Each structure stands twice: as C-alpha cells, then as structure tokens.
Regions:
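Short, solvent-exposed amphipathic alpha-helices that sit
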Residues: 74-89, 145-150
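ATP-dependent adenylation/pyrophosphate-handling site
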Residues: 15, 22-73
Length: 232
C-alpha cells in the first residue's frame, strides 16, 4: 500500500506561514530520478498541502546509479519509477529528459537553461525548486546554475533545499503533519525499486530531519519584477 499526498483546506491553511514561499504552481527540477523524493519530498509535500500544483522536470534517466539485483536495464525502469514516485507525492505533471547522467556539468549551461525555461513555460510555474548546489554533486550544481538563468529569464523565483547553517537559509516546519509528510516521502522513495539497496540509508537521513526543512533563495522574489517578497 502507498500513501499519497492530498490537499485539504484546513491543512492548507496550516502551511500559509511566512516560512513557506507563496506559490500556485511549483516546478521541481532535478538531476536524476529519486531526488524528487529523497531530497525534495519534504518541501514538495508542504507546497502541495498549501494548495500549490506540482510539476517535475528530471534532466537524466539516472542510468549511472548503482542498481539492485534483478534489473537488467536501469534506464528503462527509472522513468516508470519516477512516475510512480511523482504520483505518491502529488506531482501531476512529469517530464524526463535524456541528458547523460553524470555529465550534466559538461553540457552548455545555455542548453540546460533552455530546457528548464521550456518547462517553466509549459507548466506555467510561478516558483522553481531545486537541490542547492552546496548539498549535492557537480550535476546538482549544473542544474542550479541553469535553473538560476532560466528563472531570471522567466522572471520567477528560484528556491533551493539546503542544509542548516547555510547563509541566508531559513527553516520550514512541517509541524503536526511531519509524520505524514515523512511517510509519504519514504513511500515515494521506495517506488524506485532499482535503488532498493540504498533505501535504508535514505530513510535514516529522512528520520534525522524530523519536522524541519531548510531552504534558501537562488533567485529571490526581490529580483523578480512583480513578485511578492518572501523570507530570506
């Protein structure tokens, strides 16, 4: 059985706090499948509960990841896994690009920027969410650079999930919904069956987060004409 995210008005009000950026349509951009759950699952849950619609652009098939036994073609399985995980998280629209996993930093930033800008337009996003470059690898840094350029061109804010203590960061408290949020996050991560051997470590990391998520701006609303200024 899986647990899926839903939106209820009384719960949505609980997340209309100053700590959560205001958004109607959130686009998450990731380097590889699984990050939408393991890294962004908490913030995406909060946005979904606040009433925002969610979309996802994953730039690679994650074909270089180590896989659990029993799977012969990881690149064929992972797009299906991300669709299942997205459904559990309440993400309504998913695009998976086919850039080479492990080589995102070798693509021209302008090429990745164009792909992200297209997704912003396609899904009418008014906020973009990524993994902060200081918490990921060189692929995540490449995504953050391209997303920054795309957000500036599209005139939408760009938020990043980061770690505590980073300059300019703030915390989002999932509050009473934390237990449900983490259960949904873990259920979505478990949808990536090719990565089942890594699941216990991921669950341990999520458990250590408790009810808190840490975010910071890469492109703040103050840099985007016509956008409301939010925390940070």
């Amino acid at each position: 059985m899986t647990i899926e995210a839903t939106t209820h008005p009384e719960v949505a009000r609980a997340f209309t706090l100053d700590s959560l950026p205001s958004a109607v349509r959130v686009l998450a951009v990731t380097a590889r499948p699984g990050q939408e759950s393991a890294d962004l699952g908490g913030p995406l849950y909060a946005f979904r509960r606040s009433g925002a619609s969610l979309s996802l652009l994953c730039l690679t098939l994650g074909e270089t990841a180590a896989q659990s036994t029993g799977f012969t073609r990881i690149e064929a399985a992972r797009p299906w896994e991300i669709q299942m995980a997205a459904s559990i998280l309440g993400i309504s629209q998913v695009s998976v690009a086919s850039y080479r996993d492990g080589r995102l930093h070798r693509y021209r930033t302008s090429e990745l920027t164009g792909r992200i800008q297209h997704a912003i337009s396609k899904y009418s996003a008014d906020l973009v969410l990524v993994v902060a470059p200081e918490t990921g690898d060189i692929g995540d840094a490449a995504v953050a650079r391209a997303a920054t350029a795309a957000a500036l061109l599209a005139r939408v804010p760009l938020a990043a999930r980061t770690r505590p203590g980073v300059t300019g960061a703030w915390t989002v408290d999932l509050g009473a919904e934390a237990e449900v949020a983490r259960a949904i996050q873990k259920s979505a991560a478990a949808a990536h069956a090719t990565q089942s051997e890594a699941l216990p470590e991921m669950i341990s990391r999520v458990d250590q987060l408790g009810s808190m998520e840490t975010m910071r701006w890469l492109v703040s609303p103050a840099r985007v004409p016509g956008q409301r200024i939010m925390p940070g």
